[in-house]
Amino acid sequence: MKKYAELITKYINEQKYKILREPSGKLPHKFIVPGACYAQEIWDWDSWLTDVAISNTLKTDEEKNAFSEYQKGCVLNFLDNMYDNGSIPFMTSGESTFCESESGESNGAKPVIVQHALFVCKFLGDFSWLKDQYAKLKKFLNYYETNCKHESGLYFFIDDWAIGVDNDPCTFYRPKRSSGSIYLNCLMYKELLAMSEISENLGYNEDNILYQNMAKSLKSAIQEHCFDERNGFYYSVDLDLLPIDNSHWIHMGCPRHWNTLIRKIDVWSGFLAMWAGIATQSQAERMVKENYLKSNIFYSDYGIRTLSKSEKMYLIKESGNPSCWLGPIWGVSNYLTFKALLKYGYNDLAKEIAEKTVTLFGRDVENCGEFHEYYDPETGEGISNQGFQSWNLLVSNMISYLNGEPFTEE
């Protein structure tokens, strides 16, 4: 374990300055790319979590100062490319944006932009640089409120483009506006809490209360609609229901009284309900005992399967566009599940998945000199995209935890 931790730390320290980029075209501010192999690109949740990871390695004031303009610039570049409707491209390069959300008919950036902004503010101990951008943050959240919110109180993906967990069966190839994704809703809950905290620090007290209340309402909706008492797990829900027609005699005697249907597909993102602090303690206990620890569902020697081994859609293969989220081990799902376990006091299990991740990545660095994008849950072999960095760098935060050291938190 110590050998692997040292190999990983050496590798990250050698690579971290290679992810800094100078202003270019549509990216007018200095910025961080999600890995050294990226030329001039920012991606929504990749950039956020890469920043969290790299920040953990900055141990001196000199290093922090050197990175600070790149951290702020990453957020500012997203906001500078906001469309008139308030959506933000999920990816922007120096030359173009890769997104069709301007039309309102396709997904834009996921709700992580505000969280990224809050992270940078807290890491640098400075909110002042964000004051002039505050209206844009509000506009971004209002876009989701206006275009992506269902009558149930849950939010939905417009389509299956760039959802982050590319081919999650709950959204992939599903009809437009039908997926009340647990992944999306947990991110949105944290996004609203982040906006509340930013509002408070900038002196917008009414907004602070507004966003707190919006977060509370969303939490209640997630608990009501997404937790399944039978299986003890949080799921995405199907919103693709026909409207109630009380004029039709064959339905009018007892029309539907529900506005969502749980899609009981075991996807790792159910654990984001723990990461976000949405699950109750008793729900978390069931999630861990009845789901996480089951080797025929999520549990493996190398971390958490991204899709249950028992699902018909389970598949381990190399693919791109979409990348495969149908079971392989990903660094980001291991990390966020690690944080979820810590939040609810499952410290031994958190330690275990951290050790599994360090061993998995350490062996990869030892054998290949770098990381892969995702891994086989049965063998630990890298499957795709050798040289991938991005959120895999969060293993640094896990190493700090295992060493009993403080670590940066998203």
Task: Show the residue positions of the predicted features.
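Non-catalytic C-terminal accessory modules of carbohydrate-active enzymes
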Residues: 289-298, 307-309, 322-323, 336-410
